[in-house]
Curated annotation (Swiss-Prot):
Protein encoded by which gene: DED1
Main location: cytoplasm
Low complexity: compositionally biased ranges: 58-86, 653-665
Pfam families, per database record: DEAD, Helicase_C
Reactions that this protein is recorded to catalyse: ATP + H2O = ADP + phosphate + H(+)
GO CC annotations on file: cytoplasm
Name of the featured protein: ATP-dependent RNA helicase DED1
UniProt function note: ATP-binding RNA helicase involved in translation initiation. Remodels RNA in response to ADP and ATP concentrations by facilitating disruption, but also formation of RNA duplexes.
Length: 665
């Protein structure tokens, strides 16, 4: 074989990459070092064949390929948050597996190999020596988060915000803080105010005017505000502002030694936001990224229907503010990847919809069955467009000494929305819809149907009629739904056909027209559907197709139209007088889940009898046993009486509580 190689001009004794030595053999050069040897000394060899793994570059590695003693991990890189190894240079922080990814152990550390490098967080800010140090501006990220002027995919302040000063606001509870009128310090942090300015928000909405001082003052809150009124900012602004001022929390010592494969295995968020749908949690997460820009706070989002591996990797890089759907959060808790022991803020957004969708067992497990601090050890905020009586009664288990906030005619509809109701038989709906689209062809149009099959069928029909349309419903994959929403937002497909999955909470900017192709069977769903337009102070148009198949909601619909000062068609009045239309879900106005005139009222002040009140009076006849005595222990279910007349007039006592039977309402 050697002879044949020599015939070809090759030799087993020759090397094409290094000079020959006296022994006649050339040293082995690892592929990653070839071409670099001329710049440094030749690696010594003893003439014997290399044994074991080849030696590494002596200028970079210590004995046996191990890092030398002066090496320390640099801070998280900008790609995936993993440690980047490099020379410490005498000033770098030593690697501490107990601190990696734990925000509570970052104080006083320099997030870099030699006192430099980017810090962990959504905006590359730092918390160092008890101070919040914002990161440098990032033009590309700013364009991604905040858009550019006149960006159609971003919602900006509406033209009717000036009229919000005339909207009535009801705040019940003792010692309600005075509302704020501008985004200033105090009470907000300067860095948050700078991000609010980047978002071109100039004036707080009514819910924000009250929620900011309430949450900053340490109170629990139940907020009932009109759809599109800025509820997301109502809880994000005070939570992030407190985080920027107070810094991260330390991880409990019993959990500080959890470290696996160079990463923190379990996340310890300080804020938890629960919402019912994938679209809503994604929307809240996007807003959190926006207002946490250049800060030390790192938001994360988890939801079902998406790759759990990528979500786990996101959490492992650090998670200070977690936005989640209840089901996926329970899954991650069971996997041991998330602990709730550090939670300071719990937010339930669209709380009534979460219960409607059957999430109550998961919510109770998250709040009461895991390691989340008890009601007195955290702040709890509930936000939604409606809070029927049973939801308010549920609040007794989750909230303490809370302020009930009702802004405007919530549970009704916004006057910013012009509502039209047309009598259309089922067979004529498609032709009438085409007429409407030809008449109101500009802007984004959102069409609601009742079934997934109808969503696909109607979108295909519109495409065949040369209308650019797309559809979204529960059977579509998460990627298909996200793509459809993106095409709709940027105007590529200005017509979106949707089932109820997109009706609640989605903040789709600049929707000018909502069409209820199929009316829902519950009036609350109608309220939330048409609330997709007329958001953030802008005006909008709503058209509903009505026929006798919808007579179950006729009385509720008439009342809503009157409350919003809209025209009531004569055919609605006629059908209502026929006597067959009284009800809706639950068999009548105020039936079902308790909607009606009291759906936006503080149930602590509603009448109803029950045992006499007890405890020290604090507001309108007694709050019921003092601020800290309502509710009971988490070890047994509370026994409760009627909710009585007056604030604290009824009894929601729990014999297992600290002072015996105490009054709830």
């Amino acid at each position: 074989m050697a002879d044949s190689l020599k015939m070809a001009g090759l030799s087993l004794e020759d090397s094409q990459h290094a000079p020959s030595h006296a022994t006649g053999r050339a040293p082995y050069i690892p592929p990653h070092l070839r071409g670099q040897q001329r710049a440094g000394p030749t690696m010594p060899v003893d003439g014997a064949a290399p044994q074991g793994r080849p030696p590494m570059n002596p200028g970079s590695w210590g004995p046996n390929g191990a890092p030398p003693n002066n090496w320390a991990p640099r801070g998280a890189n900008n790609i995936n948050g993993a440690p980047a190894w490099g020379a410490a240079g005498g000033g770098g922080a030593r690697f501490d597996p107990n601190a990696y990814g734990h925000p509570g152990h970052r104080g006083g550390q320099s997030h870099g190999g030699a006192g430099s490098g980017a810090a962990r967080g959504s905006g590359d800010g730092q918390w160092r020596d008890g101070k919040h140090i914002p990161g440098p501006p990032n033009a590309r990220l700013e364009r991604e988060l905040f858009g550019v002027p006149n960006d159609p995919s971003k919602q900006h302040t509406g033209i009717n915000f000036a009229n919000y000063d005339d909207i009535p606001v009801e705040a019940s509870g003792h010692d309600v803080p005075e509302p704020v009128t501008t985004f200033t310090n105090p009470p907000l942090d300067d860095h948050l105010i700078s991000n609010i300015k980047l978002a071109t928000y100039k004036t707080p909405t009514p819910v924000q005017k009250y929620s900011i001082p309430i949450v900053m003052g340490g109170r629990d809150l139940m907020a009932c505000a009109q759809t599109g009124s800025g509820k997301t900012g109502g809880f994000l602004f005070p939570i992030l502002s407190q985080a920027f001022k107070n810094g991260p929390s330390a991880v409990p010592t019993q959990n500080a030694n959890q470290f696996s494969y160079g990463r923190q295995r379990k996340a310890y968020p300080t804020s938890l936001i629960l919402a019912p749908t994938r679209e809503l949690v994604s929307q809240i997460y996007d807003e959190a990224r926006k207002f946490a820009y250049r800060s030390w706070v790192r938001p994360c989002v988890v939801y079902g229907g998406a790759d759990i591996g990528s979500q786990l990797r996101q959490i492992e890089r650090g998670c200070d503010l977690l936005v989640a759907t209840p089901g996926r959060l329970v899954d991650l808790i069971e996997r041991g990847r998330i602990s709730l022991c550090n939670i300071k803020y719990l937010v339930l957004d669209e709380a009534d919809r979460m219960l409607d969708m059957g999430f109550e067992p998961q919510i109770r497990r998250i709040v009461e069955g895991e390691d989340m601090p008890p009601v007195n050890g955290r702040q709890t905020l509930m936000f939604s467009a409606t809070f029927p009586r049973d939801i308010q009664m549920l609040a007794r288990d989750f909230l303490k000494d809370y302020v009930f906030l009702s802004v405007g005619r919530v549970g009704s509809t916004s006057e910013n929305i012009t509502q039209k109701v047309e009598y259309v038989e089922d067979a004529d709906k498609r032709s009438v819809l085409l007429d409407i689209l030809h008449t109101h062809g500009t802007g984004l149009t959102l069409i609601f149907v009742e079934t997934k099959r109808m969503a696909d069928s109607l979108s295909e029909f519109l495409i065949n009629q040369n209308f650019p349309a797309t559809a979204i419903h529960g059977d579509r994959t998460q990627r298909e739904r996200e793509r459809a929403l993106e095409y709709f937002r940027n105007g590529r497909c200005p017509i979106l056909v949707a089932t109820a999955v997109a009706a609640r909470g989605l903040d789709i900017p600049n929707v000018t027209h909502v069409v209820n192709y199929d009316l829902p069977t519950d009036i609350d769903d109608y309220v939330h559907r048409i609330g997709r337009t007329g958001r953030a102070g802008n005006t909008g148009l709503s058209t509903a197709f009505f026929n006798r198949g919808n007579r179950g909601v006729v009385r509720d619909l008439i009342e809503l139209l009157k409350e919003a000062h809209q025209e009531v068609p004569a055919f609605l009045e006629n059908i209502a007088r026929e006597g067959s239309g009284y009800g809706g879900r639950g068999g009548g106005r105020g039936g079902g889940r308790g909607r009606g005139a009291n759906a936006t009222r503080d149930m602590r002040r509603m009448g109803g009898g029950g045992p006499p009140m007890s405890g020290t009076p604090s507001y309108s006849g007694g709050y019921g046993g003092g601020a800290n005595n309502y509710g009971g222990s988490y070890s047994s279910a509370p026994s409760y009486g009627g909710y009585g007349g007056g604030y604290g007039g009824g009894s929601y006592g729990n014999p297992s509580g600290p002072t015996g039977p105490s009054s709830w309402w």
